[in-house]
Amino acid sequence: MRAEKIKYPMGTLTSEGALIYDENVSGKRPAVLLAPNWMGMTDKAVRRGELVAGNRYVVFVADMYGAGTRPVDFQEAAALANPLRADAIEQRSWVRSAFETMIAQAKARDLIDAAAQRSAFALAAATSWSWRVTAPLWRQPCRSMVI
């Protein structure tokens, strides 16, 4: 299993997500965008991405706070997440940046095909915003799945 740290722009911030895939599997696979819980892009989020990826998917674990910003406890996570949760436009921008990065990075490694640009599944912790962020972004029907 390969988990590559990928830096990408998110508004005025630079974020650092993880592109995860089984390098021993050949052929194209569906891509899955994984939005971690409000603790952000932790080792646990990457391990969850590895479990989801298995030998069937390419997974991108998104970074919602920016590279190097990692909450250490519940209170700090709340302080970082609440402004994002209150701003639907920023949420959409965050998800779109992560989605576009996932598609570009996976295509560059020849892991997905062009059809992947028209669909996405976002896996997120059960939050009040996960379902409403994914659907309107790409003007295509898009489903979200909560794990």
Model-found features: residue ranges?
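Serine-hydrolase catalytic machinery in alpha/beta-hydrolase-like enzymes
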Residues: 5-111
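Primarily recognizes the serine-hydrolase "nucleophile elbow" in alpha/beta-hydrolase
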Residues: 95-147
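Predominantly soluble domains enriched in secretory-pathway, periplasmic, or organellar proteins
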Residues: 1-2
